Amino acid sequence: MSNDESLKIETATLREKGNGISEERLKDCNVLIWWGHKAHDEVLDRTVNLVQRRVLEGMGLIVLHSGHFSKIFKQLMGTNCNLTWREYGEKERLWICNPGHPICEGLDPYF
């Protein structure tokens, strides 16, 4: 993706000042991809609040594996996000809530 000149891709890490996330950086962010594994509690509450505000303003958020237990995901979902595992052969359906968002281009209304 970094070869696509229409995209501006940046990274932010836990160890950077403010976890590498500021109002200024988020202002121009269309989609934030969040990956976290074990250090969820080390993410600053201020960072979580900044990201939540931008998501509520319309910024896209893609939370990757293990991010289900991140502070931002739990705050946005309003639950503790504890998971259990089961195998019942059930299907899960995902609905596109904002089909006009560029990240949804080419996707069916649900899958």
Feature map (PLM): residue ranges:
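Short conserved AdoMet
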Residues: 2, 56, 108
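An acidic, glycine-rich "communication" segment
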Residues: 64-111
